[in-house]
Amino acid sequence: MELKTSDVAIRLGVSPKTIQRWVRKYNIPLRRNEAGHYLFDEKTVALLERVKFEQGAAMEAPPTPKRPPTPLRNNIPIDALHESIEPEIARVSSRLDQLERQLEQKADDVVSIQLLHHRQEMEEIVARLTALEQLVARLEQQLNNRPPSSHETSDEPKQKRRGLGRVMGLFA
């Protein structure tokens, strides 16, 4: 079974770059695929596991005691440095608060203007709808109040005009 560098790295719990570095450092002979990537077999993986174990043992050194951080920075006591920076921090903080308030105010203004425009559009639509309703009601009333015309009530069929109708039909 042949494995790629990333597969071996996952198996050993190290990065692919570490695998490549070990291959170069220890001159491990490997085959390459057509893309130039290393191909590892089980024997090589076992060798790399041994390298990892040896590297891990060599890397494990006795822990060095941690020293407390030095209280001086550039020969200036931290308290003095803190005192000199504190007014600047307060100024920046107040400016930030002011900018946040301005931003909120602008956002509120934009929303208010948008609501005003939407309200005006809605009022225009309602006015148009009311006018259309009135027009429809007036037309219905006119239709109901209109006396029936003579041509609508006659039950007699129209007499056909023979010659002129045919000639006129040709031009229509």
Curated annotation (Swiss-Prot):
GO cellular component: cytoplasm
Comp. bias intervals (Pro residues): 62-71
Regions of compositional bias (Polar residues) in chain numbering: 142-151
Gene3D superfamilies membership: 1.10.1660.10
One Pfam family, short name: MerR_1
Subcellular location as annotated: Cytoplasm
InterPro entries: Chrosome_anchoring_RacA (IPR023522), DNA-bd_dom_put_sf (IPR009061), MerR-type_HTH_dom (IPR000551)
Keyword Cell cycle: yes
Molecular function (Gene Ontology), one example: double-stranded DNA binding
Annotated spans, Disordered: 57-76, 142-172
Source domain of life: Bacteria
Example of a GO biological process term: chromosome segregation
Classification via CDD domains: HTH_MerR-trunc
Annotated coiled-coil segments of the chain: 83-146
Biological role: Required for the formation of axial filaments and for anchoring the origin regions at the cell poles in sporulating cells, thus ensuring proper chromosome segregation in the prespore. Binds in a dispersed manner throughout the chromosome but preferentially to sites clustered in the origin portion of the chromosome, causing condensation of the chromosome and its remodeling into an elongated, anchored structure.
Family statement: Belongs to the RacA family.
Name recorded for this polypeptide: Chromosome-anchoring protein RacA
Organism the protein comes from: Geobacillus kaustophilus (strain HTA426)
Lineage: Bacteria, Bacillati, Bacillota, Bacilli, Bacillales
